[in-house]
Amino acid sequence: MAAAPQFSTDRFALKLGLFYAAYFFFGGVQLPFFPLWLEARGLDARTIGMVIAVPTLMRIVATPLITHAADRHRALKATLAIGSVVGLLGMTVVGLADGPVAILAAFTVAMVALSPMLSLSDAYALSGLGARGRSYGPVRLWGSVAFIAGNVGAGFILEAIAPGHLIWLIVFALIRSRPAI
């Protein structure tokens, strides 16, 4: 039987674990439930598909460019911080946006800003944890746990709130990820 993960007292590892938890909680809520929010805002299936597809296409180009620039300028932490803030602001604008074009534009900005977060945070984690003689697995574990909690928790929350309010749970997860970096 595998040993239970140890709770780390290393501040870097703790902050990184919190970041992974918040970021993956965001994904755990956003991935399955964002289309329900779009539907609650009156978007039809075709428009929902466009809102989801356009940022995905943009990320194919943006992620390699952003991560390359972060590597070249040795700015992993700064790029993570900027991406978190721009992603948070973008998702906040999504929640306030009126109409499919505004939602699409704001969501594209948010997702392009957030798209390199996993690659950058993994590079940041491996570098920092390696320098401290710490393992990556126990820190990254909290992301997986939070993703599942976001999936299940948002499902329960949707029994108590209207889908139109779900965006604010997504924004809250991003607010929680910012201070953890």
Spans of features found by a protein language model:
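Hydrophobic core of transmembrane alpha-helices in multi-pass small-molecule transporters
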Residues: A21, G90-V94, P100-L120, Y124
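Residue-level signature of mid-helix packing/kink "hotspots" within the transmembrane helices
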Residues: T56-P64, F147-I148, V152
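Helix-breaking motifs and short loop linkers at transmembrane-helix boundaries and internal kinks
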Residues: R74, L96-V101, A180
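Structural signature of the two symmetry-related core transmembrane helices
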Residues: A78-T92, V171
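Symmetry-related core transmembrane helices of the 12-TM Major Facilitator Superfamily/SLC fold
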Residues: G150, H165-I181
